[in-house]
Amino acid sequence: MTSRILIPSLLVLALFSCSSEDTAQVQTSLSNEKYTQGVHYELIDNPTTVRDPSKVEVIEVFWFGCNHCYALEPYLARWKKEMPEDVSFSKSPATWNEMLKTHARMYYTAKALGIEQQFIPAAFNTIQNERRMLTGNTELEYFFMGFDIEREKYKSVNKSFGVSNAVDQADKRMKQWEITGVPVIIVNGKYRVGASRAVGTDGLFDVVNFLVEKEKRYSATN
């Protein structure tokens, strides 16, 4: 389990996830399953309902300013290429403070404008490599203009009810899931998986796949 980011920074020193303190690893209990609750994943106390019950829902909680989220992107891309049709994936931005809420609004604005796929790598690159935090109004206007989005169009969508509501919903989800660090993967609103020492970045999506299959078996028998 990870811990909450107290001061947003590009220079995060945690080993596996964007967090400010370590948590003692829980002892592995005897189990016939490959991965163990409390060690490799957590059960969410107050689970959320999925949008489409016919699919297993996988959601990544992330922040553009988190270098571990940036490092996870190629792993995520490979996993998505092999993602079964009965699994859905989406991103949900973290919203702990005003900077993160600005980035969450930026993300949902790009999504509403239909430029999400090209926007994500560009935003990560700008913040992580160019060290420009993309928080000022003028800076964001020019950034979106780089995607051929007119300034007034950007401003209109950025302040729209739809984008504001999306940010609010992301904030509610994050609190309900008790997210204390990113990146974190939520499986079917029930399970929380982070790149802890017990999991690591390489093993993260193996745990996700394990939980996806677990949910499929559960659905088949209920």
Regions found by a protein language model. Name each.
Residues 1-7:
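Bacterial N-terminal signal peptides that target proteins for export
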Residues 5, 147-222:
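C-terminal cap of thioredoxin/glutaredoxin-like
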Residues 8, 13-98, 213-222:
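Extracytoplasmic thiol/disulfide redox context detector
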Residues 62-65, 80-83, 110-114, 123, ...:
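Sec/Tat-exported extracytoplasmic proteins
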Residues 65-68, 95-99, 125-130, 162-163, ...:
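Solvent-exposed loop/turn segments at secondary-structure junctions
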Residues 70-73, 100-104, 198-201:
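Conserved strand-to-helix beginnings and helix N-cap segments that scaffold or border functional pockets
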Residues 73-80, 103-107, 120, 137, ...:
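Extracytoplasmic/secreted envelope proteins and their assembly/folding machinery
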Residues 85-145:
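Structural microenvironment flanking redox-active thiols in thiol-disulfide oxidoreductases
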